[in-house]
């Protein structure tokens, strides 16, 4: 992309973003950028942002790689512990890099019941709190009297 036909104002960008359109904008220092992160999902949720969708795809691939090495292992507590430990390490690495604010992997007798063990199924639940991106910045400037103390 070498240019944009219409230079968008801040208000233009905000108007487009309010109706779920990520505007393409030109900034002197940054160049041409997609200025937004919304998806076309109509229902408000964490998945209506591109960064969360991409994170979820990445997490599913990573945990699936861990799961694939667990296939055909004994469906016992030691295997569960190994899977959970490896998933915790993977998710912890993502958290350290600010992709997640928190997570929990549940893999125990509440998720993998004796009935599931008898059917050769290991069942884990991965709860995640994705990090959210800043979309708007609000800054207040407050003018105070000359004698005012900022400690009060």
Describe the residue ranges of each PLM region.
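Structured, hydrophobic secondary-structure cores that serve as assembly/anchoring elements
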Residues: 1-152
